[in-house]
Amino acid sequence: MDNINKIPWQPGMTLENANGAVADTSLGYQYAIQTTTLIRAKVIEQKFYKIPFAEYIPVEVGTGAFLEEIKTNLTYDSAGSFESGIQGTSSGPTQVAQVTVGTSPKTAAIVTWAKGYQYNLVELKKALASNNWDVVSSKMKALKRNWDLGLQETSFLGLKSNSNVPGLLSNSEVTVDTTTITGYISALSYTDFATFVKNLMAAYFTNSNSTELPDTFAIPQIDYLGLEVPVSPQFPMVSMLDYLEKAFKRATQNPNFKIVGIAYCDQVNNAGYWAANGSNRYVLYRRDPETLKMDIPVDFILNPAATADNYNWNGVGLGQFSGTIIYRVPEVMYFNWAA
C-alpha cells in the first residue's frame, strides 16, 4: 500500500481530521524506546468532523424495525374555488358543487447496515504489553463511530450508491435556484447584500405556493465563518450574520429562525452527489417532521464477540436507516453556485 502521505486531499473525500497523516503500514505495537522513555497513560484519539444532525433534521427512531420500506400517505383536497359553492336564493334548486380528497404514498427505503470487528489471542497479549491501550474497546468504538459518522453524512448527502436514499441537500425533487446566490454571501458589497436579503425570502415564499416561510437557512461552513464581518463601514458593530438573523426572524415572524453553517454544503465536500465537481449549496427549509424526516428503524446494536476456537473472536454491529425524505417538497429550496 502506498504511503498515505503521498495521497493529496481531493473534493469528496471523507471529512476527517486525523492525528496527522498516518500510513496504515506504520500502525502496530512495536516502536523503539529506551530506559529513559516514559509512555503516557493517556492516548490521543483521532478526530472527525461531527455535527448533531438530529438538531437540523427531524429523526424518528424505532419505526419499521427490520422491514424494507416505510410508506407515508400524503393527503390532498380537490375542492375547487370557494365561490363555486355559492347558491342562488331567488331560483329553484341547483346542483351542489362537490369536494373530493385523495392520498398518495411517499416511500422511505430502509437500508440494513452491518459491519464486523475481529481480534485474536495474540493481538490481546500484544495490546496488554503496551500498558495503555485496550484494542478490543478501541475496535468497538471505531465500529460505533463508523455508524455515527455514516448516518451523519447520509442525513445531509444521502448515498451515492442508492438514489432512493437522498439527503437533505441532495433531493432531486427540490427546486434549485442558480440566480439569487452567485457567490459567498460574506463577500457581497453592502448594496448586493441588501438585494440578496430582499430577494431570498420572496423566492422561497413563491416556491412554497405562498403557504409557508422557512425556519432554517443552512449555508456552506466557509461562508458562515466569514459572516462576522461588519455589514458596512457605517455600521461596524453590526455583523452580516447578526443582520441576516434579525432580518429573517422579522420576515418570518419566527424568533427561533436559525442560520447554520454545515460543511457538507461546501463544494469541496459534496463532489459526486448531485454534480461531478459539487457546488456550494444553500438551503432554506422547515425543521418540521411533516416537511422532512430521517428514519432509524434500528439504532446501532453491538453484538458481543464470540469465538469458536478460543483463539479468534468475531463481533458484529448493525442497524437500519433511511435517507432524509422530503414530504412537502415546496417547503425546501436549494440555492446553488459553483466555483
Residue positions per predicted region:
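Hydrophobic side chains in beta-strands
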Residues: 113-119, 219, 317
